[in-house]
């Protein structure tokens, strides 16, 4: 169901800019649009209204030779966005094609900020010299104000081709897609019952199992989904004595390093003597002495 304003917005009549000549450029060059007067903007601002573009028409009238080639690209940018995300809509058409471009806005903007809409053009793959006054542009804007913003049904940009030798197969235009949205849960105490609390802080008499997500709730103990997410949920019911893993590896290593094993000198000599004798007896072959006759 389309959202509607409780009170119809105050609509301005179409505000037309002059039909001015523009020089051919391979870089983005601004097309000057005529916006409501400063007095009108101040009046809307004092009434605490916001504004949107209901309809924007860009008229293109070429003035190049019949053998001119190339494409004209017209872009609408919203300067509230970062430079690489400001493009809202674009049109591409032959340089010799007289055409009207139509754009419908999908958002409001605040009159406390500079008007964010900018219109640019550039020419590519052309055999016409740069800085040649190749065409005339004229912009027409219809704006409206409202006490507050509402959801605006999307309307795609369109074109009206005025040159008979061209058709919609020679034209291309596009509109930016909706921004991607990803839900990000806020970790707070109010969500602790869902196992989404922040860093665990143990207090005297508490165990890690009773404070962590494996034992925070008993209301969903019979839920298969909850059991799959937290398979050790009820581990805290076993008691701290069962959950105690014992001394850590560092403690055991320190204890081993501190163990006292003492031997007297006589005991150490006896161990060495017996070890040497054992080696001699096991590895030396006894040779019978030869008698002299």
Curated annotation (Swiss-Prot):
Q: Where in the cell is it found?
A: Host cell membrane; Host microsome membrane; Host endoplasmic reticulum membrane
Membrane topology according to the record = Peripheral membrane protein
Q: How is it modified after translation?
A: Phosphorylated.
Q: Which Pfam families match?
A: Gemini_BL1
Question: What's a single GO CC term here?
Answer: host cell plasma membrane
**Superkingdom:** Viruses
**Entry's Gene Ontology molecular function annotations:** DNA binding
Report keywords, A-Z. Answer: DNA-binding, Host cell membrane, Host endoplasmic reticulum, Host membrane, Host microsome, Membrane, Phosphoprotein, Transport, Viral movement protein
Q: Which InterPro entries match?
A: Gemini_BL
Tell me, in one coarse class, where this protein mainly resides: host cell
GO BP terms in the entry: transport of virus in host, cell to cell
Q: How does it assemble?
A: Binds to dimeric supercoiled plasmid DNA.
Q: Which family does it belong to?
A: Belongs to the begomovirus movement protein BC1 family.
Q: What does this protein do?
A: Transports viral genome to neighboring plant cells directly through plasmosdesmata, without any budding. The movement protein allows efficient cell to cell propagation, by bypassing the host cell wall barrier. Begomovirus genome is shuttled out of nucleus by Nuclear shuttle protein (NSP) and the movement protein transports the DNA-NSP complex to cell plasmodesmata and facilitates further movement across the cell wall.
What protein name does the entry list?
A: Movement protein BC1
């Amino acid at each position: 169901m389309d959202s509607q304003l409780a009170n119809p917005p105050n609509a301005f009549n179409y505000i037309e800019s002059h039909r001015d000549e523009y020089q051919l450029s391979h870089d983005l060059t601004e097309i000057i649009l005529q916006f409501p007067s400063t007095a009108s903007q101040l009046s809307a601002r004092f009434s605490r209204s916001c504004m949107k573009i209901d309809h924007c028409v860009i008229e293109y009238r070429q003035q190049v030779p019949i053998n001119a080639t190339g494409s004209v690209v017209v872009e609408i940018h919203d300067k509230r966005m970062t430079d690489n995300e400001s493009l809202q809509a674009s049109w591409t058409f032959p340089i010799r094609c007289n055409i009207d471009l139509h754009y419908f806005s999908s958002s409001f903007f605040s009159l406390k900020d500079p008007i964010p809409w900018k219109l640019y053009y550039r020419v590519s793959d052309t055999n016409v010299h740069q800085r040649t006054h190749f065409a005339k542009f004229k912009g027409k804007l219809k704006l409206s104000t409202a006490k507050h913003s509402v959801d605006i049904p999307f309307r795609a940009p369109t074109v009206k081709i005025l040159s008979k030798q061209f058709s919609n197969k020679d034209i291309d235009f596009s509109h930016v897609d909706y921004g991607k949205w990803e839900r990000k849960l806020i970790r707070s105490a109010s969500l602790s019952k869902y196992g989404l609390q922040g860093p665990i802080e143990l207090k005297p008499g508490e165990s890690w199992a009773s404070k962590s997500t494996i034992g925070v709730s008993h209301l969903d103990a019979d839920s298969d989904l909850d059991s799959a997410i937290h398979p050790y949920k009820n581990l805290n019911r076993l008691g701290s004595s069962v959950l105690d893993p014992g001394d850590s590896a560092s403690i055991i290593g320190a204890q081993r390093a501190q163990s006292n094993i003492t031997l007297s000198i006589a005991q150490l000599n006896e161990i060495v003597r017996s070890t040497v004798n054992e080696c001699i007896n096991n590895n030396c072959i006894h040779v019978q002495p030869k008698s002299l006759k």
